[in-house]
């Protein structure tokens, strides 16, 4: 299975050398590291080229690497139902950088890009309706960023007295604690009766 993917990787890297920075095959999937400026052209090429025929955009997501200058990897998953191949496109961008929208090539990218914006705060230029899709209207922050607090900023509850939903700052019943989840049986060296004589 990896030999056809190797050939496909070579083919794409040769045809689109303007945007493919590197590629490899991992877990029977082709991974391409690409430049953000040419992502729309590459996705269109992968969809329309007779050799590739990646007609289905499965998902768009992102990964937050807080320690890097290019903080985010925006990841596109494409499927060729004709060739039974998958490709993963990785685009590394800075926190203040915008990604071009691929809605013109894959209309299904509309909600995927809105989800990435909502969860990570990554903006997509050319998107017709870039607003939150999973969090509430007045939600503050982007929950899948590594710097977002695990408790959040506000809690939402229904107030019986006011007969409406209210937003309040998070108030923890107890101080935030770090729990040690290490099993007491892992890593311990127990000396059983009779074993002390062996030493």
From Swiss-Prot:
PROSITE patterns documented for this protein: COMPLEX1_30K (PS00542)
Pfam families hit by this protein: Complex1_30kDa
Give the UniProt keywords, A-Z.
Cell inner membrane, Cell membrane, Membrane, NAD, Quinone, Translocase, Transport, Ubiquinone
Give the E.C. number(s): 7.1.1.-
One GO MF annotation is: NADH:ubiquinone reductase (non-electrogenic) activity
Coarse class of the protein's main subcellular location: membrane
Q: Which InterPro entries match?
A: NADH_DH_suC (IPR010218), NADH_quin_OxRdtase_su_C/D-like (IPR037232), NADH_UbQ_OxRdtase_30kDa_su (IPR001268), NADH_UbQ_OxRdtase_CS (IPR020396)
Q: Which Gene3D superfamilies match?
A: NADH:ubiquinone oxidoreductase, 30kDa subunit (3.30.460.80)
Q: Does the keyword Cell inner membrane apply?
A: yes
Its domain of life reads Bacteria
> In UniProt terms, what function does this protein have?
NDH-1 shuttles electrons from NADH, via FMN and iron-sulfur (Fe-S) centers, to quinones in the respiratory chain. The immediate electron acceptor for the enzyme in this species is believed to be ubiquinone. Couples the redox reaction to proton translocation (for every two electrons transferred, four hydrogen ions are translocated across the cytoplasmic membrane), and thus conserves the redox energy in a proton gradient.
What protein am I looking at?
Answer: NADH-quinone oxidoreductase subunit C
> What species is given as this protein's source?
Roseobacter denitrificans (strain ATCC 33942 / OCh 114)
Quote the gene name from the UniProt entry.
Answer: nuoC
């Amino acid at each position: 299975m990896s030999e056809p993917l190797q050939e496909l990787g070579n083919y794409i890297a040769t045809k689109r050398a303007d945007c493919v920075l590197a590629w490899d095959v991992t877990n029977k999937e082709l991974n391409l590291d690409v430049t953000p400026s040419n992502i729309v052209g590459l996705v269109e090429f992968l969809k329309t080229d007779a050799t590739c025929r990646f007609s289905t955009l499965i998902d768009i997501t992102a990964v937050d690497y807080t320690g890097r200058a290019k903080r985010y990897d925006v990841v596109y998953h494409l499927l060729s139902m004709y060739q039974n191949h998958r490709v993963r496109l990785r685009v590394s961008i800075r926190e203040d950088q915008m990604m071009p929208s691929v809605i013109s090539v894959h209309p299904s990218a509309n909600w995927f890009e809105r989800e990435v914006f909502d969860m990570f705060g990554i903006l997509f230029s050319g998107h017709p309706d870039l607003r939150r899709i999973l969090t509430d209207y007045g939600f503050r922050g982007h929950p899948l960023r590594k710097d977002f607090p695990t408790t959040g900023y506000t809690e939402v509850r229904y107030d019986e007295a006011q007969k409406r939903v209210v937003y309040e700052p998070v108030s923890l019943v107890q101080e935030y604690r770090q729990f040690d989840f290490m099993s007491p049986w892992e890593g311990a060296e127990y000396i059983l009766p009779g074993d002390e004589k062996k030493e």
